[in-house]
Swiss-Prot record:
UniProt entry keywords in alphabetical sequence: SH2 domain
Signal peptide annotation: none
Region of interest (Disordered), residue spans: 180-232, 256-321, 408-436
Protein name according to UniProt: SH2 domain-containing protein 7
Length: 451
């Protein structure tokens, strides 16, 4: 009995009591006072009454009585002094009254005039009489939460499941229910984890019927394995033609790399395979931005000193609606002996973008569709244009274009400059007004009229 009283009183220390030495000493004195003078009078048939909760704080008391019916009450030990406190659920909030013990060992509520011989008699009195000045009465005792019983039941159930595999695992869940009726306000506690239940199902499968053994284990479908290549599985519609053409071009370029390098020399870094649609749009836009008005597109990617840096003969292009992947093929006729960008001071040549029906028919009749989509460019514009590799035949395209030189184009002073140079003598005409002076006069005239 003494051990149960100590567990009840010291098991619920007030919040922050462990940090304060004074509160700890006060609780020790209150516990000694309760054990020596109060316990024999409170015990009913060797057990504590359901309305006595021992050491609990005001905050914990209000949490217990928050959702209880009007008039639900409990008696607790004060955590600030040696005495009792009556707490009950009022009409608008929880109310707390101090219970004092007189010299004649009788109990009285502070502020009241009627005393009682025991706490049980005091509780019975206020269940029939009203508490002044609130005109409220006590109804039912708020039971203590049976936390220890619940934990003991869970522990016994787990121990029985692991140690005695002969018993069915359902006993672990049946023993969770405590023997005594637990309080509705008992705090939720962790139940038996799924891991222990799964282990118990695996240990004793012979005690279950065939249907139960099939329903008991819950199996989760494995996650799908991720693909190592996005280009192989991610695209299954018509739009994957772009990637198929790109892989075919890479295979053809790798297969013919050794023979092509022996005949034509090292291929420039810019002539490698690119994304067909994006690279074609970039190159066409660059060519249109660099050309002057009235002239065809200037050959992009050509350096006057180093020759071609990228291969402009084949620009990959894919139809956006899912049609067959096609490339653009451009043909260069033999260049004039005068236009040699490899020599210093020579003028850049300008070409016109024209369509050739013969090339279209020739490309459509070409049987080989697995070849490379790029052609080798001669290292110097002055040399004869080499034919593409025999094994490399471009795929057909609805539009196949070439370039031809425009006759009568005046040579420019600089190789990379496509604009006409204006002689310096024209800027020194006598009848022309100097631009800074003209702007200065207009500015002062504007300010004069404004103010």
């Amino acid at each position: 009995m003494e051990d149960s009283l100590k567990q009840l009183s010291l098991g619920r220390d007030p919040e922050g009591a462990g940090d304060s030495q004074a509160l700890a000493e006060l609780q020790e004195l209150a516990l000694k006072w309760f054990m020596e003078t109060q316990a024999p009078f409170i015990l009913q048939n060797g057990a504590l009454p359901p309305w006595f909760h021992g050491f609990i704080t005001r905050k914990q008391t209000e949490q217990l009585l928050r959702d209880k019916a009007l008039g639900s009450f409990l008696i607790r030990l004060s955590d600030r002094a040696t005495g009792y406190i009556l707490s009950y659920r009022g009409s608008d909030r929880c109310r707390h009254f101090v219970i004092n013990q007189l010299r004649n060992r009788r109990y009285i509520i502070s502020g009241d005039t009627q005393s009682h011989s025991t706490l049980a008699e005091l509780v019975h009195h206020y269940q029939e009489a009203q508490l002044e000045p609130f005109k409220e009465m006590l109804t039912a005792a708020c039971p203590r939460p049976e936390d220890n019983d619940l934990y003991d039941a869970i522990t016994r159930g787990l121990h029985q499941t692991i140690v005695d595999p002969e018993n069915p695992p359902a006993t672990a869940f049946l023993t969770v229910v405590p023997d005594k009726a637990a309080s509705p306000r008992s705090s939720p506690k962790p139940q038996v984890s799924f891991l222990h239940a799964q282990k118990s199902l695996d240990v004793s499968p012979r005690n279950l019927s065939q249907e139960e053994s099939m329903e008991a284990p819950i199996r989760v479908s494995p996650l799908p394995e991720k693909s190592s290549s996005l280009l192989e599985e991610s695209f299954g519609g018509p739009s994957d033609i772009i990637y198929a053409d790109l892989r075919r071009m890479n295979q053809a370029r790798l297969g013919l790399g050794t023979e092509g390098s022996g005949r034509h020399g090292p291929v420039p870094a810019g002539s490698q395979a690119y994304s067909p649609g994006r690279e074609a749009q970039r190159r066409l836009s660059d060519g249109e931005q660099n050309r002057p008005d009235g002239l065809g597109p200037v050959l992009s990617g050509v350096s006057p000193d180093q020759g071609p840096t990228e291969s402009p003969t084949s620009w990959g292009c894919s139809d956006a609606m899912g049609s067959l992947g096609a490339t653009w093929r451009q043909e260069f006729p033999k260049l004039s002996q005068e236009a040699q960008p490899c020599s210093q001071g020579s003028s850049a040549d300008i070409y016109e973008f024209i369509g050739t029906e013969g090339l279209l028919q020739e490309a459509r009749d070409t049987p080989d569709q697995e070849g490379s989509t790029y052609e080798q460019i001669p290292a110097c514009w002055g040399g004869p244009a080499r034919a593409p590799h025999p094994g490399a035949s471009p795929t057909y395209s609805p539009w196949v274009h070439g370039y031809k030189r425009i006759s009568g184009t005046p040579e420019l002073s600089e190789p990379g400059n496509t604009y006409e140079q204006i002689p310096a003598t024209k800027s020194k005409e006598t009848g022309r007004t100097h631009k800074p002076d003209k702007l200065r006069r207009l500015f002062f005239t504007y300010r004069k009229h404004k103010f």
